[in-house]
Amino acid sequence: MSGIFIAIILLTILALLFGILLGFAAEKFKVEGDPLVDQLEALLPQTQCGQCGYPGCRPYAEAIANGEKINLCPPGGSATMEKLAEMAGVEPEPLSATEEVQVKKVAYIREEECIGCTKCIQACPVDAILGSGKLMHTVITDYCTGCDLCVAPCPVDCIDMLPVEQTVKNWDWKLNAIPVKTLDEDCQC
């Protein structure tokens, strides 16, 4: 019985020593990231669609910090591009020519043709497609960014990209362009 307690105590001491060693190494060899890259990445839509020519939003944020164009993110639209311009300290540019003419589109699945293969669900970077294996799928249009990544994997071509009508609910009001003054808590107004 005492052999088990000795083994437990030795393993506990060994675990504590390794924990201290790993904690020290983590602090000693810590790699600081660029705070500008973190801020730029937070502004991007995080769809990881690759339409900008980079494999994800983080590499595109790093490229912007190194001087790349800020108008390459179609899912983000002009609002994201304007915020990126402000953060990067450059002039806003119009979005790429193809995006400037296009209207916002969302995916639409013709459910009567859907075979339930789940390939579109796996391709969607924002989980905007609802469904399960061998059952029809549908798109949650409020979540769809229009990145078009779900269309190509569909084996029966039952996914279309349809333009979104401008309504009061989805109109771009640009409310964050209105300056707002915040009051301090100790202000007696």
UniProtKB/Swiss-Prot annotation:
Gene3D superfamilies: 3.30.70.20, Electron transport complex subunit B, putative Fe-S cluster. The keyword Cell membrane applies. It comes from Shewanella sediminis (strain HAW-EB3). One of its GO terms (molecular function) is electron transfer activity. This is Ion-translocating oxidoreductase complex subunit B. Residues 1-26 are annotated as: Hydrophobic. Keywords: 4Fe-4S, Cell inner membrane, Cell membrane, Electron transport, Iron, Iron-sulfur, Membrane, Metal-binding, Repeat, Translocase, Transport. The keyword Cell membrane applies. GO terms for biological process: electron transport chain. The complex is composed of six subunits: RnfA, RnfB, RnfC, RnfD, RnfE and RnfG. NCBIfam families: PRK05113.1 (NF003475), rnfB (TIGR01944). Its EC number is 7.-.-.-. The lineage of its organism: Bacteria, Pseudomonadati, Pseudomonadota, Gammaproteobacteria, Alteromonadales. Pfam families: Fer4_21, FeS. Part of a membrane-bound complex that couples electron transfer with translocation of ions across the membrane. Coiled coil: none annotated. It comes from the Bacteria. It is found in: Cell inner membrane. [4Fe-4S] cluster 3 binds at C124, C144, C147, C150. [4Fe-4S] cluster 2 binds at C114, C117, C120, C154. PROSITE patterns: 4FE4S, 4FE4S_FER_1, 4FE4S_FER_2. Signal peptide: none annotated. Belongs to the 4Fe4S bacterial-type ferredoxin family. RnfB subfamily.
